[in-house]
């Protein structure tokens, strides 16, 4: 069904029916992002359980190269909500900012007179990024298990300098993701997903046929057809032209007019996560990393001073 209103970019909701071997599997399969928080506060004891679950997540070498900034003050939460364009951030009783943190480990190395190059190493950056997100997801799961909900805030990426100033982040500490925690006014329904048969590959990468691939995405976004209007056509045309030239822009518009609607993938990369803007700030982000004390993208030169 076509709608003049732009659909949620989070996809279709669904009620999941089925039997589970235990409550943990049920919780994981039916997990959904929460954006309507109630006024109920999180009891300190419950919050401690949740945070403890986070810090016990696996990390490379058990180094725990991340820190979590806990935000409870209403004034700061509202400032975050305005900054990240998400009103519900101000409604959530707790916001957690997850940061890669090599500052703490570098201080430890200096105090114990140990060599340290982690902020200049892509290997360390890559593992610490994974570690930070694994810790965040542990906290999400712990929160769900205790009757709370959560939602990740991707737009925090756009305001890294402001976050650094707000939370007094030292060099070697880089914000990765913001997470809101709280109780639901109304429990959210989970979103439809691609199936195990699409995401999991046996022994090696296996290309689906075009038909199977299209069927898989049609199953994930059933009936999602965005209505055509001149503004949307104009916007998509510009994105296509910027990304792949005039010929591709004409081809995309012809497909839209032939179908009689804008498809989900045309909506995602033509109107929402617009493909001509998403790569534009790559250099800016690298410069930001350098300001935060990270140099893993530069050639490393070993010490050449006096031995």
Residue positions per predicted region:
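Acidic, surface-exposed loops and disordered segments
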Residues: 1-307
């Amino acid at each position: 069904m076509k709608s003049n209103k732009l659909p949620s970019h989070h996809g279709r909701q669904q009620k999941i029916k089925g039997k589970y071997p235990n409550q943990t599997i049920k919780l994981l399969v039916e997990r959904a992002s929460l954006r309507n928080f109630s006024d109920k506060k999180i009891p300190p004891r419950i919050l401690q359980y949740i945070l403890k679950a986070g810090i016990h997540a696996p990390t490379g070498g058990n180094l725990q190269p991340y820190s979590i900034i806990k935000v409870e003050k209403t004034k700061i939460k509202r400032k975050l909500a305005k900054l990240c364009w998400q009103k519900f951030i101000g409604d959530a009783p707790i916001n957690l900012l997850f940061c890669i943190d090599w500052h703490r480990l570098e201080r430890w190395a200096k105090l114990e007179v140990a060599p340290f190059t982690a902020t200049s190493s892509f290997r360390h950056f890559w593992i610490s990024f994974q570690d930070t997100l694994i810790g965040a997801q542990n906290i999400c799961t712990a929160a769900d298990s205790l009757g709370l909900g959560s939602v990740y805030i991707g737009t925090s990426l756009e305001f890294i300098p402001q976050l650094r100033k707000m939370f007094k982040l030292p060099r070697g500490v880089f914000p990765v993701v913001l997470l809101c925690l709280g109780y639901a006014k109304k429990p959210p329904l989970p979103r439809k997903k691609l199936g195990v048969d699409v995401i999991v590959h046996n022994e090696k990468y296996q290309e689906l046929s075009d038909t199977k691939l299209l069927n898989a995405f049609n199953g994930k976004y059933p009936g999602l057809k965005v209505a055509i209007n001149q503004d949307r056509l104009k916007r998509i045309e510009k994105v296509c032209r910027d990304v792949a030239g005039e010929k591709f822009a004409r081809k995309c518009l012809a497909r839209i007019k032939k179908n009689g609607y804008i498809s989900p993938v045309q909506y995602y990369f033509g109107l929402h996560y617009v493909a001509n803007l998403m790569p534009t700030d790559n250099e800016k982000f690298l410069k930001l990393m350098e300001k935060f004390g990270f140099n893993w993208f530069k050639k490393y030169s070993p010490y050449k001073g006096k031995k």
